[in-house]
Amino acid sequence: KVKLVSYVVSTAYGLKPGANVKVEINGQQYEAAATGDGQYDAFVKALRFIYRKYLDRTFPLLQNYAVSIPPGGRTDALVQTVITWNDNGKILRTRGLDADQTEAAIKATFKMLNIYENENTNEL
């Protein structure tokens, strides 16, 4: 139910990292931009804005973020990102795998969002 339509994340020396994000949630498209302390932080801030402004809902709290690269990994090694989320006391752990660390985190985030949307749809 939650699809990533497009995104751009940027980082530049001397400038704050930013993200432009377009997502589709339950068939409706939303777009937002944000800056943050890093690319992923900016990405999540844009998603939080969408959930708050357009959906009038909370966004689960990121509780822990762990990145692992296999021993002996090179610059093109797969990165595993495991993110622990807290949704009003309910703990959820999702994993993303990609050669790019930010993309791995984004994959883990969208796994969480689809679980979150499925649970919220069932409650209605």
Positions of predicted regions on the chain:
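Terminal or standalone catalytic/regulatory effector modules within metabolic enzymes
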Residues: 1-124
